[in-house]
Amino acid sequence: MIKTIKSEYHSFICRSRMIILLAFAILVWQVVGSSLCNHAKMMEAGLQLFEPYIATANSYLVLLIVPIFALILMSDFPNLEDGYMFTIYRMGKTKWLIGKVIFALLCSFTIMAIVFVLSTIPCAGKISSGTKWSPATTKLAYYYPELTYNTVFNLIQRDIYNHIYPGIAAIHSILLTTLLIFGYSLMLLIGKIFNKKNLFMGIDVVLMAAGGILATIKHKAAFFFPAGNASLAGRYTEIGRTSNMPFYLSYIYMSVWIVLMLIVAFVGIKRLSLIHISEPTRHAQIS
């Protein structure tokens, strides 16, 4: 099973679809990186290490960019081509499913590592030491009040930097978004098990859009959706210490969501028929 996971992981890293990284890097630079570097120049101060990532993953301007990027990379998961049928025969359905779950988790962490690196590299020349938010984030509106309501100049909102340190914010964001990607991947896996891949892909998109849009407008209903719980946006009020959703509740939400999907997957795999799972006319039933 370990060898199979390693082989599939290597294929995931090396496949041609990774060209989307170039488009992601360009978009991040144009929307986030160039703006943050400009802010640092205006304030004559450096950026905190985690600010580029936090702006990329949690800005109201590009709130859905990371989940969309991840869903595109994972859209063909699980990959069941002719060569994989022998693997399922040899491993057994349950071991195959466990391998797919581990593979999805590895890919989720990998995607978040890529997002962090691609978010940080464009601003590397402006990053300085320090554990607190930079003046480019916290004081820009004070010195340039005319830019207060300009979305591009508010990539990191006050409801984030007024309540939590950047390092802690980045850790929570990375962990919750990793769980989000993992959850979306499990839904694709369930869709394949029940031969309803397109339906579950559509459900992923709807959940992503609903949670992201509600978080963008700071509506509390965002926390009924996985994407809303993965975001820092709208989690706090701008003034005061009121929390709309404590982090521990978001971790509980994500954990329950993932556990429920794992239960469905393991129940479904017992009833899985491999007929038509890859190509409708080329496989015989295996039960």
Task: Report the location of each language-model feature.
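Membrane-interface capping segments at transmembrane-helix boundaries
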Residues: 266-275
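Transmembrane helix boundary and interhelical loop/hinge segments in multi-pass membrane proteins
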Residues: 72-89
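Single conserved hydrophobic/aromatic residue that forms the stacking wall/gate
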Residues: 275-287
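Aromatic- and glycine-rich beta-strand/loop motifs that create alpha-glucan
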Residues: 1-24
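Central hydrophobic cores of alpha-helical transmembrane segments
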Residues: 23-26, 198-212
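Secretory targeting signals
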Residues: 28-76, 98, 102-193, 228-254
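Interfacial transmembrane-helix starts/ends
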Residues: 5-6, 13, 94-105
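Membrane-helix interface segments
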Residues: 17, 92-94, 196-201
